[in-house]
A protein has these predicted regions:
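Bacterial N-terminal signal peptides that target proteins for export
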Residues: 1-12
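Periplasmic polypeptide-binding modules associated with outer-membrane biogenesis and secretion
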Residues: 4, 27-334, 343, 357-377, ...
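N-terminal signal peptide c-region/cleavage motif recognized by signal peptidases
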Residues: 21-23
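A generic structural motif
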Residues: 90, 473, 552-556, 710-712
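Gram-negative/organellar outer-membrane beta-barrel architecture
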Residues: 164, 168-177, 185, 190, ...
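Short glycine/proline-enriched loop/turn "hinge" motifs that connect secondary-structure elements
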Residues: 381-382, 537-541, 696
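C-terminal outer-membrane beta-barrel translocator/porin domains of Gram-negative envelope proteins
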Residues: 488-670, 675-677
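C-terminal beta-signal and terminal closure region of outer-membrane beta-barrel proteins
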Residues: 673-727
């Protein structure tokens, strides 16, 4: 007894003291909520005072002198640990594992000397192992030292993890896969935190960057763990207009007022109030906003909602760019000769993203003009349907009535009989000939008309879904008039006349329009579809593009024909890396590869169905967008056709690319099925092929093509200058 009293006097730390660490875990359902958790240091029972201090309530034996310097801090006393015992796990299925975890967490071992602070640290370490919901250390005096009895309460065996709220973006299978290795085992709070971080990473990987997982909010004795999930929701979307410097106010301190209607911007945003915020969706939304072509910069700010944690307002800072433009230039085409052109356009009419433009060109052989109105997305249409209306006027020399001419321009009058000339009068002779008079004017075709078109993506009513399929419906009407350059109407044309009057075979005199009329009225509707999986709409290297369409012409009078035009094309791109001339195709370590090259294939075909075919509606083969070794419409004029192209595109410098191509086309012998057989009379072959090479220069207005191609591997070469890729 004296030894025991002596030990107590030597270490007031122990005595009858009890040290405990009881984490405030959630209680079973229906239990009262626990009090706020105290620090571990405050969970130590009966912390004894310094033995040098008098007992509480007892006055000191001597009067304290005048204030004196504090004595040096005394070292904590240490006692000998005789034994460490873990209790509370007698019937636990993982007793051995948990006991080892508790022992491993403690620094105090039999034979060691420890202080009260060190013992408290051990208590905290046992709890920090994550296996226990309650930890208490009871020092018991013994003849050989202090016996430490560590009483623990193990966490329940994990059976299920629930998320609150239940309506989450996180799939149940992801939760199951995350915790499957832990089910049926004692819950470890450290492992639980690791699993929560895995779920947090899943949210981040899926773009839910505002989502937060906390808890556990409740751990039931049956092993059901509840975690709190705050996904982060959108409260609203606001549009804020900025100047070029990024300021919301002008020099006078007034708010910047934009031209664009706010709904033009917000309709491109898929994130709606109440929806879970997703960074990926917002990035796609920003791309769509840029894709309108109306804005030079878009700044995004997430504004937290006061008093509503987890809710944000998306603020879009918009910098508008000029929507009006005027441009002009000079050019050359076979149908117009040398021409001048002027274009006027406003791409944001009335701030509603409407596009209104006019194009006027006038050349040696005619001119054309049109006014086009486009609404890229009819307001409040969930299918993102677009609308376009066009009014046009043109007077051109159709190349189907022309033969090859290697000179820079055509003559307005043709005296050698190589092309069709207008017939001013004709007399039919009995011997299969006709006597014709002509002014040797080249045949011109004038068109005046209008059309409207609707395009609807097959997106299932989701305007933000990338739909590969699009449906096209259009209606149109036009009046077509064959004439000479003075504007006089003529119904017949002749080829081979070298004088006026002249006697020519009757088959060399043809009708220039349907029913040999001076005017034709064409009324039609067209149904079409497109399918695209291209990886880049401007310079694709991978994917497919399919276009199908049928246009039905309906008679509205004696000189109005009825027929149908069917046409389709298919394009396929295969990414390759054959030539590595461009340095981007040979990146150094750490550099990003930039080597856009592809092997491209295109097949197109079409046919006219019916007998009322106006000659000017025939299919033309040859030209910069057809078989490139031939001039426009110089290969064939047919009722049916097919073309095929194989092309290899590769970069050379940053803005210069090269191409090697092979084109081929045929009319399937249908030149004679066109009334008057203009292609046959002009000696057009009807089929041919063309290998060639080219350079493509990337410019602000698009790619410019400079190509050289030969006709059927002969010495006849043609040079072509075009805008944009052929396909």
């Amino acid at each position: 007894m004296a030894g025991l009293l002596g030990l107590k006097a030597a270490w007031p730390l122990v005595g009858a003291a009890l040290l405990s660490a009881t984490p405030a875990l959630a209680q079973p359902a229906g239990s009262p909520a626990p009090a706020a958790e105290k620090p571990v240091s405050e969970q130590v029972d009966n912390p004894l005072a310094d033995p040098a201090s008098p007992p509480a309530g007892q006055p000191p034996t001597t009067q304290a002198p005048a204030p004196a310097p504090e004595p040096a801090a005394k070292a904590e006393p240490k006692v000998l640990i005789a034994e460490v015992v873990i209790e509370g796990l007698q019937d636990h299925p993982e007793r051995e594992r948990l006991e080892l975890a508790a022992y491993a967490a403690m620094a105090a071992t039999p034979g060691s000397r420890v202080t009260r602070t060190e013992l408290q640290t051990d208590l905290s370490a046992i709890y920090a192992s994550g296996w226990f919901s309650d930890v208490r250390i009871q020092p018991v005096d013994g003849p050989l030292g202090v016996r430490l009895v560590v009483v623990v309460v193990a966490n329940p065996v994990l059976q299920q993890v629930k998320l609150d709220p239940a309506d989450l973006k996180l799939p149940a299978q992801v939760v199951q896969d995350t915790f499957v290795a832990d089910y049926g085992k004692t819950l470890n709070l450290n492992t639980l935190q690791t699993r929560m971080q895995e779920l947090q990473r899943w949210y981040a990987d899926q773009g839910y960057s505002l989502a937060r997982i906390t808890g556990p909010s409740r751990v039931s004795p049956e092993g059901v763990v509840e975690l709190l999930v705050r996904q982060g929701t959108v409260e609203g979307v606001e549009v804020q207009f900025l100047n070029k410097e990024g300021s919301t106010t002008n020099d006078k301190g007034e708010p910047i007022r934009g031209k664009t209607k706010p709904w033009v911007v917000t309709r491109e945003v898929s994130l709606r109030p109440g929806q879970v915020f997703n960074r990926r969706e917002l990035e796609e939304d920003i791309k769509r906003i840029y894709g309108t072509g109306l804005f030079s910069d878009v700044k995004v700010t997430l504004k937290p909602v006061p008093a509503e944690p987890g809710k944000v307002v998306i603020v879009l800072g918009i910098v508008e760019q000029s929507s009006g433009s005027i441009s002009g230039g000079l050019g050359y085409s076979q149908s117009q000769g040398v021409f001048g052109q002027i274009q006027l356009q406003d791409s944001n009419l009335f701030g509603r993203a409407w596009d209104l433009g006019t194009n006027i060109s006038y050349g040696q052989y005619g001119g054309l003009g049109d006014i086009t109105f486009t609404d890229p997305w009819i307001k409040d249409n969930k299918y993102r349907t677009s609308f376009r209306a066009r009014v046009f006027f043109s007077r051109e020399v159709p190349q189907l009535f022309q033969n090859e001419n290697n000179s820079f321009t055509y003559e307005l009058q043709n005296f050698d009989g190589a092309d069709f000339d207008v017939v001013t009068s004709r007399t039919v002779n009995n011997n299969g000939t006709e006597t014709v008079t002509t002014n040797f004017d080249t045949v011109a075709i004038q068109r005046i008309g209008a059309n409207v078109q609707f395009v609807r993506p097959l997106n299932g009513g989701n305007p933000y879904k990338k739909a590969p399929w699009n449906l096209i419906l259009s209606f149109g009407g036009q009046e077509v008039t064959p004439m000479d350059f003075s504007g006089s109407k003529y119904s017949y044309g002749v080829v081979g006349a070298t004088s006026s009057p002249d006697v020519v075979p009757s088959n060399q005199v043809i009708c220039l329009a349907f029913n040999c009329a001076s005017e034709n009225q064409l009324v039609s509707f067209r149904v079409g579809a497109t399918y695209s999986t291209l990886n880049d709409p401007r310079n694709p290297t991978k994917g497919n593009f399919l276009s199908l369409g049928t246009e039905q012409f309906i008679s509205v009078g004696e000189n109005s024909p009825t027929f149908n035009r069917v046409r389709g094309s298919f394009t396929h791109y295969i990414p390759v890396e054959w030539l590595k001339l461009f340095k981007g195709c040979r990146p150094k370590p750490g550099e990003t590869k930039d080597c856009k090259q592809a092997l491209a294939f295109q097949v197109s075909a079409g046919s006219l169905v019916g007998s009322d075919i106006p000659p000017y509606e025939a299919f033309c083969l040859g030209g910069g967008n057809s078989v490139r070794g031939y001039y426009d419409c110089d290969l064939g004029v047919g009722k049916s056709f097919a073309e095929a192209t194989i092309e290899y595109r590769f970069p050379i410098f940053s803005i210069i690319s090269g191409e090697i191509f092979f084109d081929a086309g045929t009319t399937f012998g249908t030149q004679g099925d066109i009334p008057g057989n203009p292609g046959g009379l002009l000696g057009k072959k009807g089929e041919g092929y063309s290998p060639g090479i080219g350079l493509i220069v990337t410019t602000p207005v698009g790619p410019l093509r400079l190509e050289a191609a030969t006709q059927d591997f002969t010495s006849d070469w043609r040079f072509n200058l075009g805008v944009g890729w052929k396909f």
